[in-house]
From Swiss-Prot:
Keywords, sorted A to Z: Carbon dioxide fixation, Lyase, Magnesium
Gene that specifies this protein: ppcA
Listed NCBIfam families: PEPCase_arch
Name of the protein this chain belongs to: Phosphoenolpyruvate carboxylase
A biological-process GO annotation: tricarboxylic acid cycle
């Protein structure tokens, strides 16, 4: 495997501030072509996720990038110097969108053709602009094997098939390159994450891979099990992946899908060094929209440079798995009980959260996860934004279940959790229980574990949001939600 990218820019709609290149309130279509160029050329990201999962994606992205920004890509070759990595739906989970995955796979050789023409014009060696596909919500290796095999058998494999009178498909429409792709599992559900080592081993063995990139989610596990549980699940998964790699010789290159909100990973430009230290075994971090657009551009570039230059890919700090799993169980159960009590209000609030990307309905894992019941909730960003809107950072939920012994263990195993808790607690408004069916004492128990000064501007915004919700003033509620998001520098 060639050098692994450090910074994967994504299209997550967690930004409070709109970027300069979009005319409306939603980033979509041609905006995302310009965004990809911007993150490569101005921010220093070396990878852009091109997302078809839960949103519309442009299958002609490669052709448009190369034709519009030819001078840049003549010096920074797409596929080697910078990457475009597509994410499609998982047919086993999102059946109504399943065939979109096939369309994505069929488009890869067409993108290669565009890159071949571009390379010829500029005297460059042709390289595949797209050669990896991210599959979300993976629960077993069969889902990866199916994608890998489909591409080789039915996309490139049809080249030698005769279409008429002995003429082959390749003779008719040209070569099909690249000959093969690699599949990146995006693993989001607890049991699958804890079995990530088995999933990667089985996939690598089936296709004789000597290296695999594996994408561990941070937002959806938090939505499903709570903030602390999400980090501990990731830490156990990373330890197991490392042990598998040592035992088999398969190189594992972890990606962590962290956002700016503490609940979703607490990865901001200002916390880049702290995140790299907390997850030094990770090799690629996601750079989501709030990271890119809610800070001054020089601050963003500094954060990108910090991650790019960090000493990543280190062996994990050993964690007591049995102890970690016990804390996960205890806090996740407490978190689920609180979510049960507030789900209705969260859904109501989410309708007032501004959209930042053109997206479709997302199936998600929350409704399928027994650990959290059968509540239908918004996506993680909308959920997080809804709770922040009324001064209840979701990082606080479930934290009251920590015993003093648990807290001592967490300070040793993952001390960054208390930074997450502190960064969230400054936005806590005790009045949130006026509109959320939560116990004051349990929230206070979480807040009291850290020493913070409340953010007065955010407190005022959440006071206004609570008042507007109670009196049914929709416009005032929307305005207060936006004001609070700008103050904390992320939407959700």
């Amino acid at each position: 495997m060639v050098d692994v990218p450090r910074l994967m820019s994504t299209q997550h709609p967690d930004n409070a501030t709109l970027p300069f290149f979009t005319a409306g309130d939603v980033i979509e279509g041609e905006d995302e072509i310009q965004e990809a160029y911007y993150v490569y050329s101005h921010l220093g990201c070396d990878e852009q996720m091109w997302d078809f999962e839960g949103k519309e994606g442009d299958e002609y992205a490669v052709k448009k990038l190369l034709s519009r920004y030819d001078e840049f890509f003549a010096d920074h070759q797409l596929g080697t110097d910078v990457r475009l990595t597509v994410r499609g739906p998982n047919p086993d989970v999102e059946g109504s969108e399943a065939k979109i995955l096939l369309e994505i796979l069929e488009s890869i050789p067409r993108s290669f053709d565009a890159a071949r023409r571009f390379a010829g014009e500029y005297g460059l060696e042709t390289t595949a602009p797209i050669f990896e596909v991210i599959v979300p919500m993976v629960t077993d290796a069969d889902q990866l094997n199916a994608v890998h095999e489909y591409y080789e058998r039915f996309v490139t494999g049809k080249a030698d098939e005769a279409v008429w009178d002995g003429r082959t498909v390749e003779e008719w429409v040209g070569e099909f390159d690249p000959a093969s792709i690699t599949v990146i599992p995006l693993i989001e559900e607890r049991e699958a994450m804890l079995a990530a080592d088995d999933i990667v081993r089985e996939y690598a063995t089936a296709h004789d891979q000597d290296a695999v990139r594996v994408f561990l989610a941070r937002s959806d596990p938090a939505l499903n099990y709570g903030c602390l549980a999400a980090d501990l699940i990731n830490k156990v998964a990373l330890q197991r992946l490392y042990e598998m790699s040592e035992a088999t010789g398969v190189d594992v290159h972890p990606i962590l899908g962290a956002g700016s909100a503490p609940f979703r990973g607490n990865l901001t430009p200002e916390r880049a060094a702290a995140t790299a230290d907390a997850y030094s075994e990770v090799e690629t971090f996601t750079v989501q929209s709030a990271f890119k657009y809610d800070y001054p551009v020089e601050t963003v570039r500094d954060g990108v440079a910090t991650l790019r230059d960090a000493d990543l890919g280190a062996p994990p700090f050993p964690i007591d798995e049995a102890r970690a799993l016990a804390v996960i169980d205890r806090t996740a159960d407490a978190y689920a009980d609180q979510v049960d009590a507030i789900a209705g209000t969260v859904n109501r609030l989410s309708s007032y959260v501004p959209d930042r990307r053109a997206r479709k309905l997302h199936v998600g894992l929350f409704g399928y996860a027994r650990e959290v019941g059968e509540n239908a909730l918004p996506r993680a960003i909308g959920y997080t934004a809804s709770l922040y809107a009324v001064g209840c950072p979701p990082t606080l939920l479930g934290a009251h279940a920590l015993t003093d012994d648990d807290a001592a263990f967490v300070r040793e195993a993952f001390p960054a959790y208390f930074d997450h808790l502190a960064d969230a607690a400054r936005y806590f408004n005790p009045r949130c229980t006026d509109v959320l069916d939560l116990d004051d004492d349990t929230l206070a128990a979480a807040v009291e574990r850290v020493d913070v000064t409340p953010n007065s501007e955010h407190r005022a915004a959440t006071d206004d949001a609570i008042d507007a919700l109670q009196r049914g003033d929709d416009d005032a509620l929307r305005s207060a939600i936006r004001r609070g998001a700008r103050e904390r520098q992320f939407l959700g």
